[in-house]
């Protein structure tokens, strides 16, 4: 896995260097000032939880390195609307192209199609990418502790705070969790995939959740397929899940989302702007 992460970092840093040559940081800052202000990502999750429901971060993902093409019929705005109608709280959109066939455009057009906040799902190695994310419309960024040292993690967090964005800080084990908690961010994601073996187990979330202070919001990631999985995590104080591949493979994404959230088949959408802007 270390070799994979090194390969990813190498091509991402090359991408960043090329992007900086095309668009300066000052120009990016000006772009950020001209876009709609961030929608409250954490607020949207908290609103679902306040209703006693599992909060879903629904992922728009075309492909992955291990599984190849996941969804051939790939229409980000339509998928975003299907997720919103299914009761999702937020979106996660892949913007990495080499490994996931993602695109910045997917993030922008998916978010424009709905009222949900959106996460830029990507490998971040430079605060410049945080400004990119905001310019593209993202409301939240991902900080993967396995990919960054503490100094870089702090710099990414600070850039997000400057822009009024939220951060999802992702951990895989106890050592990463200790480092993540030092960042003092409200949202901690536990990835159930073992980076050494690639095995996925919900026991990872259950084990690490017990070590997270009560004032943090916990997100379960990977290996979540059913309403029963959600209920299992909820019993361990995990009130949010991030799910992508299993929903992307469904023909009726809205119906699949409702089943995952244990919701009735009728529409579950409602006014959210007042909550997010409050």
UniProtKB/Swiss-Prot annotation:
Q: Where does the secretion signal sit in this chain?
A: none
State what protein this is by name. Indole-3-glycerol phosphate synthase
Q: What class of enzyme is it?
A: lyase
Q: Which InterPro entries match?
A: Aldolase_TIM (IPR013785), Indole-3-glycerol_P_synth (IPR045186), Indole-3-glycerol_P_synth_dom (IPR013798), Indole-3-GlycerolPSynthase_CS (IPR001468), RibuloseP-bd_barrel (IPR011060)
The entry assigns this protein to a family as follows: Belongs to the TrpC family.
Q: Which keywords accompany this UniProt record?
A: Amino-acid biosynthesis, Aromatic amino acid biosynthesis, Decarboxylase, Lyase, Tryptophan biosynthesis
What SUPFAM superfamilies is this protein classified in?
Answer: Ribulose-phoshate binding barrel
**Part of which pathway?**
Amino-acid biosynthesis; L-tryptophan biosynthesis; L-tryptophan from chorismate: step 4/5
**Catalytic activity of the protein:** 1-(2-carboxyphenylamino)-1-deoxy-D-ribulose 5-phosphate + H(+) = (1S,2R)-1-C-(indol-3-yl)glycerol 3-phosphate + CO2 + H2O
User: Per its UniProt record, what HAMAP family does this chain match?
Assistant: IGPS_B
Keyword Cell cycle (UniProt): no
Gene Ontology MF terms in the entry: indole-3-glycerol-phosphate synthase activity; phosphoribosylanthranilate isomerase activity
The record, for PANTHER family, names: INDOLE-3-GLYCEROL-PHOSPHATE SYNTHASE, TRYPTOPHAN BIOSYNTHESIS PROTEIN
What EC numbers are recorded for this enzyme? Answer: 4.1.1.48
Record keywords: Transport included? no
> Which residues does UniProt call coiled coil?
none
Q: Which GO terms describe its biological process?
A: L-tryptophan biosynthetic process
